[in-house]
Amino acid sequence: MTDTAPVPGPPPPTGPAPATRTRTGPRRFVAPALMVGPVVFFAVFFGYPVTAIVARGLRPDGEWELGHVGEVLADEGIRQVLWFTTWQAAASTALTLLLALPGAYVLARFRFPGKRLLRAVVTVPFVLPTVVVGAAFLGLIGRGGLLDDLWGLRLDTTVWAILLAHVFFNYAVVVRTVGGLWSQLDPRQEEAARLLGAGAFGAWRRVTLPALLPALAAAALMVFLFTFTSFGVVQILGGPGYATLEVEIYRQTAQLLDLPTAAVLTLLQFAAVAAMLGVHGWTVHRRESALRLVDAAATDRPPRGAGERLLLGGVLLSVAALVLLPLGVLIERSLRVPDGYGFAHYRALATTDTGTFVVPPLEAVGNSLRIAAVATLIALLVGGLAAAALTRGAGRLVRGFDAMLMLPLGTSAVTVGFGFLIALDTPPLDLRSSWLLVPLAQALVGVPFVIRVMLPVLRAVDDRLRQAAATLGASPLRAWWEVDLPLVRRALVLAAGFAFAVSLGEFGATVFIARPDEPTLPVAIARLLGRAGEANYGQAMALSTVLMLVCAATLLALERIRPARSGEF
Amino acid sequence: MTKTTVPSSGPVPGAMLRLEALTVRYGGRPVVDAVDLAVDAGETVCVLGPSGSGKSTLLRAVAGLAAPDGGRVLLGGRDQEGIPPHRRGVGLMFQDHQLFPQHDVAANVGFGLRVRGTGREERGERVARLLDMVGLVGAERRAVTALSGGEQQRVALARALAPGPRLLMLDEPLGQLDRGLRERLVVELRSLFRRLGTTVLAVTHDQGEAFALADRVVVMRDGRVEQTGSPVDVWSRPVSEFVARFLGFSNVVPATLTGTTAQCAWGAVEVAEDAPDGPVGLLVRPGGVRLSEPLAGHDAPASGEHTAQPGGAADTTAGRDALPGLGCVVKGRTFRGDHVVLHLDPERGPDLEATCSLRAAPAEGAVVRVRFDPEETVLLPPTG
């Protein structure tokens, strides 16, 4: 492709700068320009701290000690950890998809009373700190738990406890990611397939499934990543017999202070996550399918017939058993006081009497909300820019960028938190005493969510709409503002909700960097759980309940915010 | 007979749009191949061609949505290279409208004004005026998704016109509408563009649409301009077999010209044109295929215009074998409202099409004799 054409006649008098005379014109530079912000953000707040801590492990005295890598990899125990980490993640992902896909379908296609509540309810577990979930499941299936009381059934220290807790956690990922897109697919597509002779399942498989596949793959990838790097759940429910890489890294870092081994394991996890993302990129292959999205409100209908009612009932039942029961046990424990039930634990939260905190634990609510709000803003900004870049660009550079943005999900939070501490403590990046440190760390986890939620919807926006805007005189920025934004507003709200929720629940990194006088809710809960005594346990349960309610309230509010013109979406 | 690849209709310094050797390639293949074209201010030019002839790409290159690989696009005399679409001041009506689903009718039509910072009040007035013009009075608050195809078309037109583009481009403007609506709209569009003095570049694959709309027609083939001219010009004097066939003429055969007689598969055909002897292509318009005599026993309408030829009466009296002309079996008849198209299978040579009046149409299976009217023949360049 030539830049300038051999045009006969006089040359153009006032030609623009040569840089714009390329084949694709200025558009070629749009994607890289949008990528600058996110890349800098990730370099400074992810690449730098993680590199710093890994280097500290592998170069303790300024000398590379790479021999240690081989030692660690040859270790039989480490190999077992690696194997367990992988297969439990695969099993958890399969189980989650199996149980949550009917839920996604029901929430996408059926209209029934309490639907909004149901959607919020299944999302609550996702934002609960792992320690709380661990505790809740212990209360359900552990020693002296509900099932133990009733039938003498105990599942703790078995792998089933881990798998169930993972399903509990990630149910919302599938429901939200897959169901969100599903509810915007035009049901008439399936109807058309039916009229062409496809059976109900055949129509779904040939029409809906291919459209859902990118979202499905994204959801499966997320669940696999979360469960692959699972930490709190495995540590609490698995007992000493089971450890994931993440648990092992924590053990090596915080308990054994074996930074070299932790560094090797961190790199190992990195490699595994990178491989996963590679496989993901290869399978999904980024087909830019311009789906015809319709208003979600127009696609649902009351369930018809016994089969559909049965399906709805089954979903409600499974949600009750999987999600409500553990949460119910959590609440029950928070109200249980030595002489029956009462609010003593909640009252204690407003005081500093227990001596665990310098401030009343209830202040953690305000801290958490404020920090999560800032983290959400950062995540939306960085993630939004990144998603916009990913929509516009293609090719190797952009795909690598896409994978890079997913890395924080697969990186040990312990590594990130510890890395923040040792890396961001010297000018000009001395953020140790800045309140921004915590939101920055939390935003890191929020960004991948923002991207995953925004990308399918942004990609589904017909490029010709932007072109129409351009021929009407709208600059690219203006076209984005006028065309993309209104179409993706719903997804943006959803992304904000996700980012806010994961920020609220983030624990692994926050626990390292939160200031003692400004604990977040998960940190405060963990501190209470770490103390012995019924009172502390009760207060932890009470504070967990508070966190749960805050999350539920936030999510319900988000469910209510709908774009003004959604009827035309 | 030479192919007229007229660069433009003479030197037009005032041409609103001027393409100079414009070339656009997709994957190395030229989709628009060294096209020269000029559109004067106030003129309506229609690019006509089958799908894949590069006409849509031509529009996209002018709009700045596709980057040329060679040549220049000049708007109002200024080279547009490097100028992004939103600064070119051209309007494009997309084939499938591409109305903004999240905006109502008024917001769609007023979009171009809004991004230019036109005030709310003025915008409202102009939107109302435009909607009035396209026949959608009071539709401001309606959702575009609830509009019928014809209404969407009108909104798309109003939206493209609103910012007062110096050049309005239409991509298959009426392609998706049913015929009645299309025919009505084409007339409306033409008078509207006349009234507004809009400069229009339209592309279509529908010759009827092109001829009804355009002051000038440009026929494209494989990215190249095959013929340019007024609708009447192009219609009456297609310059190549491609153009002739694309316009719907199927009576085209290779022939050898000697004087004014073309020897072809149908026999010797007299032509009215003067051209050097040698190989040519011969087109006989359906209207120039004159029916002489159906079989005895069929009513031979002497009043029919097609049979009222000199010699027609003589033919009927003579024996069949001695009749001049070409014997044909009527294979089929297609009614076209006021006339009938006959599909004829001649005793020699490829199939023929002839038109005749409804009343004069012979039945299917009838045997007729045809003669060719020299005035209705066109000599084309020899076909490869």
Label every model-predicted segment:
Chain B
Residues 27, 250, 261-384:
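Non-catalytic connector elements of ABC transporters
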Residues 17-27, 73, 331-332:
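Conserved beta1/A-loop at the N-terminus of ABC ATPase nucleotide-binding domains
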Residues 71-79:
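Conserved ABC transporter NBD signature motif
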Residues 89-91, 95, 99-242:
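ABC ATPase nucleotide-binding domains
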